[in-house]
């Protein structure tokens, strides 16, 4: 089963930027949230991902690590075709005494703990975090693809 390109774009717009997905059911379509809220972005230490689990599944625990929030709006994200990209850099805390090798990312519901994990993906290259290393996604580098 597959969705059309236009529906993939509409779904990403609704989920990532809180923009209505028009013409689903009626002209108004699937409506946005009254309050857009944020996604909490996490970093993971395991290659590949499982669709089971929560935000803590394979989440890194390097010294000083914390999830970072990103608003669900068109100021923070751009949706083009089947891909959503971050419009601004997303920085994480600088590594401390204990490090980790990062393989992936997640978008979820909670600032900490076992929140809902909505979207998972792999980094384009692994990143070894140690003391003084600051993980980040440059603007346009975090791709969420609906294909």
Enumerate the language-model features and the residues they cover.
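Small cysteine-rich, disulfide-bonded extracellular modules of the LU/uPAR three-finger superfamily
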Residues: 1-104, 109-147
């Amino acid at each position: 089963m597959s969705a059309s390109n236009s529906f993939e774009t509409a779904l990403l717009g609704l989920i990532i930027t809180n923009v209505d997905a028009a013409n689903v059911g009626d002209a108004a379509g699937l409506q946005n949230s009254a309050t857009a809220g944020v996604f909490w972005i996490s970093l993971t230490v395991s290659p590949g991902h499982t669709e089971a689990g929560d935000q803590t599944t394979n989440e890194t625990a390097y010294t000083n690590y914390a999830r970072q929030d990103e608003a669900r709006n068109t100021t923070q994200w751009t949706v083009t075709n089947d891909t959503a990209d971050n419009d601004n850099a997303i920085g994480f805390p600088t590594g401390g005494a204990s490090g980790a090798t990062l393989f992936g990312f997640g978008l979820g519901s909670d600032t900490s703990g076992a929140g809902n994990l909505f979207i998972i993906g792999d980094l384009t290259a692994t990143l070894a975090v140690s003391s003084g290393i600051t993980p980040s996604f440059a603007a346009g580098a975090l791709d969420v693809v609906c294909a």
